């Protein structure tokens, strides 16, 4: 079984749905589509751990490779019965580190689950900001399309969300195109 099928299967095994009725695979595909749209922002030539130019692609993982895998697995630790080590075995350490970073903390509400420590972990993990943005963009696109109440919640959260991810409109940011795209989704 390839890693995409493995990620989808973990959500199936826990009867995990998106918006209460869609197979969770729908959301994973949406997040991966956003990744594909913005993958040009990611390095695809150099190995993440060493910085060496990739000469053996299946054995050397670039930031682009790790993020692609992490978009498929971004909710595994949070929503299924798999551990960090399970994810590491199936998707590799680089993707597992990203997935771990975007996994919500324990908390009684959204604010507690996604506090300062959570966002610090995302900012300090290579690729995690990209994957978190892919997830948020997919959720906002879906919320806008379905006129979901979640769309208004994401709109309200957006200024703090982008601040916590380290975006400043007055400074260059490698993911600036993604932040602009996300902001534009909230325009009427």
Regions found by a protein language model. Name each.
Residues 1-188:
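Active-site helical microenvironments for divalent-metal-assisted chemistry
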């Amino acid at each position: 079984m390839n890693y995409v099928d493995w990620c989808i299967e973990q959500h199936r095994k826990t009867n995990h749905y998106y918006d209460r009725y869609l197979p969770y695979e729908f959301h994973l595909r949406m997040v991966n589509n956003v990744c594909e749209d913005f993958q040009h922002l990611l390095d695809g030539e150099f190995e993440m751990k060493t910085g060496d130019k990739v000469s053996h692609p299946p054995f050397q993982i670039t930031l682009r490779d790790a993020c692609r895998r992490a978009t498929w697995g971004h909710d595994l630790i949070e929503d299924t019965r798999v551990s960090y080590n399970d994810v590491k075995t199936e998707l590799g350490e680089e993707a597992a580190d990203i997935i771990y970073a975007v996994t919500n903390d324990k908390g009684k509400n959204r604010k507690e689950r996604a506090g300062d420590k959570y966002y610090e972990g995302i900012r300090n993990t290579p690729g995690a900001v990209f994957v978190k943005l892919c997830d948020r963009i997919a959720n906002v696109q879906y919320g806008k399309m379905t006129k979901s109440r979640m769309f208004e919640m994401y709109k309200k959260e957006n200024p703090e969300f982008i601040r916590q991810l380290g975006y400043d409109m007055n400074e260059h940011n490698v993911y600036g195109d993604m932040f602009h795209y996300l902001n534009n989704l909230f325009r009427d």
